[in-house]
């Protein structure tokens, strides 16, 4: 983010900057329903609604946490060591319509940041699709938001945050607090819950690829608000971030398809959608630091590397259902590290990457930030997951997973065609069974 210190000024907010950030906030909020469609199309028919619900309920849960204390802890004055903010603005206390953050109303800035927190939590759900206990997810999201997302956001963007102000690593729009935290958390929960029934044995292809493409399109559209909005103003930096976002999404798509064509002999719609997202993930931290040429390379590298990374789960035996690790963790690492290579003074205001004579110093700072955030996130998320699994169970029962979480947890099906799953007839005994196991969810 361009502005990291909360300020209050007598001057009025700039109307142009405010109008742009209002639009950007709405665009980023749209990304969560887009993600729901993207994920919903990738799962099997028996768990579509559950996947949608995990994203939509995250909107409500994270919003409440953010308004009560999350914003204050993330963006309030540093409480010491650059680790966490204070509770001065708990319940949004002291933030009225006249409060200004830079050139925009503070309440708008807080809402913009809220939309980032929402989609980050929702992203994690893709790693545990088809097998997570819904009631456990309702507890996990607020706890994870407070213990993982909020501190990391303060480190990167908050007043006095240690990554930005002491280490000197750069992250324009969320490679560390959004992409790497969601990916590392997804990996941790994969290990806590274990693989789906039939992993590496049964075909688990996306059930609705047009739905996946629609979701990817909405994500791409919203990403312009995500990245260009992080300039916090209607200015040249926002324009550069906007164009870099478009460029990296395109080369990410092409890079993934190139690998598919060479490796598998055919480009796929799933590959196109995933490649675009991989490029967008990688440009998120770097869109305000690299030139257009750098953005093209960042997207291409992410698309190609992530297309290989999504297959690691079969070799290493972790079931990352919807490739959160392969796309968001790997893509986030690629984009964050490449700042140290392609950063230009004209974009950053001073910092230069290796390619432009800056040496290895900035690359080293980026690497330290990546390592610390990934390790902290993985460790804390794994601990939360293990605790919830012990206290209330984090994994759905085998009966729920076999029948499908839509019917057994939500008492609904996405497609009311008299069939459940891949053409399997619905037994009359399924509905009573669903009502019985619903009490366990």
Regions found by a protein language model. Give the residues of each.
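Glycine- and aromatic-enriched membrane alpha-helices
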Residues: 2-441
